[in-house]
A protein has these predicted regions:
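Long, contiguous binding/interaction regions
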Residues: 2-41, 56-88, 96-136, 142-193
Length: 193
């Protein structure tokens, strides 16, 4: 999923989300649309492609039913690690430090991940979106302490005004047992099955 621009709209109504997704692809020739349900009863519409069509599609989606929009994000120069992480790619390595940004929306987590990656030389260990999190989002950054601090700070600044930032922590020298758990999986059930 490598395209220069990415937009995502998060809806609290499945019907409104489907309506918006239809309007988005009818309005502009985006390269790709991915849409579907996530917990708890939300609907996500993600489009990628060239900047202008993605921006047009986003505007059409937001206009279709603005009352059902929980949050949205538009990234005209999305960092390459973000689409990979959305597609569930994980980077199984924690270096010197771990940074975690917790959000109340999927869109805010994606925005935070992009901002953090652009601010510092870090790896996006994982981007967790909604399912198994009660609709929350989590961005996990790994790298040297100063870079992780810069990534987390930039993430927080980028999404602070949205009201969707729940928490952000930096853990230098993560204990090896905790690191092993996080590298294997961040879902509890995955680790015990």
């Amino acid at each position: 999923m490598t395209h220069p621009a990415l937009a995502l709209i998060e809806f609290d109504s499945i019907a409104s989300g489907i309506l918006a997704g239809d309007a988005m692809v009818k309005t502009a020739p985006v390269a790709r649309i991915v849409a579907g349900t996530v917990h708890p009863g939300k609907y996500l519409v993600l489009v990628t492609g060239d900047v202008a069509p993605v921006q047009e599609a986003l505007a059409a989606g937001l206009a279709s039913d603005s009352n059902a929009v929980v949050d949205h994000v538009f990234l005209p120069g999305v960092h390459p690690q973000v689409p990979d992480a959305i597609a569930a790619a994980r980077q199984p390595q924690i270096d010197e430090a771990l940074g975690i940004v917790e959000t109340s929306s999927v869109a805010a987590a994606i925005h935070a991940a992009d901002a953090g990656l652009k601010a510092a030389q870090v790896t996006l260990l994982e981007l967790r979106l909604a399912d198994g999190l009660g609709g929350k989002g989590l961005a996990f950054f790994a790298g040297v302490v100063t870079d992780v601090e810069a990534a987390v700070d930039s993430s927080c600044v980028a999404i602070d005004s949205s009201g969707h930032l729940l928490n952000a922590v930096i853990i230098p020298q993560l204990h090896s047992e905790m690191a092993a758990n996080l590298v294997e999986a961040t879902r509890f059930r995955t680790l015990i099955s």
